Structures are given as structure tokens and as C-alpha cells.
Amino acid sequence: GVQTCALPIYPKQPAEVEVVLFTPRKEVMTSFKHIVRPEDILIHKRGTTHVTPHRYMLRSGNEKECIDVAILAEGYTEKEMNVFYQDAQKACESLFSHEPFRSMKNKFNIVAVASPSVDSGVSVPRENQWKHTAVHSHFDTFYSDRYLTTSRVKAIHNALAGIPYEHIIILANTDVYGGGGIYNSYTLTTAHHAMFKPVVVHEFGHSFAGLADEYFYEDDVMTDTYPLDVEPWEQNISTRVNFASKWKDMLAPNTPVPTPAT
């Protein structure tokens, strides 16, 4: 099944954690509550030993005052880690070549985390290629050739244990086009495709800022994600059910909506 992870502050006293799932119509689908007891002997305190090797690409300040982004290696063997660090530096430079990241660069720390894989590259199910990699990523998510994700979210966080982070970028060691970004979870993109630099920024917009895709493909697996009678929560798209809550006030008077392509 698909895993997810929450990153609550470690409580000093027993604390209730609640997870609520919503439908695309913003209706509660189901919920789950769990009591976290800090004295529980079955809580594995990871990150105190065996911390994954890592190197800072950018260190602007204390982790308590900055946004900490971890760039994680996927599909890089131990012998390929120098390549990974070079790729991580390219991702960092690409991110801060765009606004608003460029003007806020001093608010970020970027750390490259060298999580090793047994095999080089990533899995491609449609070609019957399954590899043993750090976070078990693969193409063909939802049977879409380009959609590269992993369902092994716990493996991601285990690899990052002991390293300060709030957001995650995973670099896949392949030249095949693809990627994915899941809000408040992770960005995953291929590091050796010609479109790597813009794609990593695009996918980070999904995972970091909660932005939606602004393009459309025929027969896309995500085509029916948004009911047309409900205003999406993402700030960069609209069904015009409540367009005033988005960017309507930024349009010039008499601008037709939808706006014809010119």
C-alpha cells in the first residue's frame, strides 16, 4: 500500500494525532486518531547513530530559523556519489535562479544526502526493469510513462533521520524524462534528462507550495481530479466557482475569461 509520514514535534506528554482524508469535494472521507506516548519502548529513535552521509550545498543559518530542504540520492551507487553531489548542486542552483526563491535564498538551508543504492538507475515497470534502490522509486505510476514516484515514504524519512529537514527533493539517477511532486511530501525528478533543471523547480512547486499543474493532456490519468462545481484549494488554478478568491482582482478590466490564446 501507499505510505505517508507526518512530522509532528516530538511530544513531552501523550499527544493525540489525527489524520483526516477529504474527497475532491472537500467532504470528509475518513479519519484516524492515534495517541503518541513518548515513553513507548517501541518508538525507534532513529538518527542518533548511523546517520546517512551528507553535505551542505547552502547553509544560510540555524535550522530553527531557516527552511531546511534535503536533496536525497536515488539510484546512485556508492561509487556514483560524486555524480550525485554534482547533480544536487545543479538542482540547488536551478531552484535559486527563480523567484521567489532567489530573493529568499538567505532563508534556506540545502543539504545533499548520499543515500546509496545497490543498483544504478531506477525501475521502469513497462520494460520489466525492477531495481534495488534507496527509496524504491519507479516510473509508470498510475500507468503514466512519465510519472515517477515512490510509495515507500518511510524509506525516505529513515534515510533522512538525524538530519534537519522540512522538505524533500529526490534526484533519480536516470536520463529518462519524468518526475512527480506531492504536496508536503516530496519532489522526485530525473537528474540527467535535458529538462532536469526546469522540471525540478516545477515539481518543487507542487511539493513545497501546493501548486497544481496548469497544463492538460488528452487521456491524462489526472484529468478528472477536480469537480467543475467546486473551487480547487490550489491557489494557481480555478474552476471559476469562486474566482474572486484567486487572481481575479489582478486581471485588467474587460479581460475575457477564459482568455483566448494569442
Annotate the PLM regions.
Residues 5-7:
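Short, small-residue-biased leader/transition segments that mark boundaries at the very start
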Residues 12-26:
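Short, aromatic- and glycine-rich surface loops/edge beta-strands on solvent-exposed regions
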Residues 25-59:
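Short beta-strand elements
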Residues 47-97, 102, 112-122:
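Fold-level signature of zinc-dependent metallopeptidase catalytic domains
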Residues 81-84, 179-203:
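Short pre-active-site segment immediately N-terminal to the catalytic Zn-binding motif
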Residues 107-183:
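Active-site-proximal segments of metallohydrolase catalytic domains
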Residues 204-220:
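Catalytic Zn2+-binding segment of zinc metalloproteases
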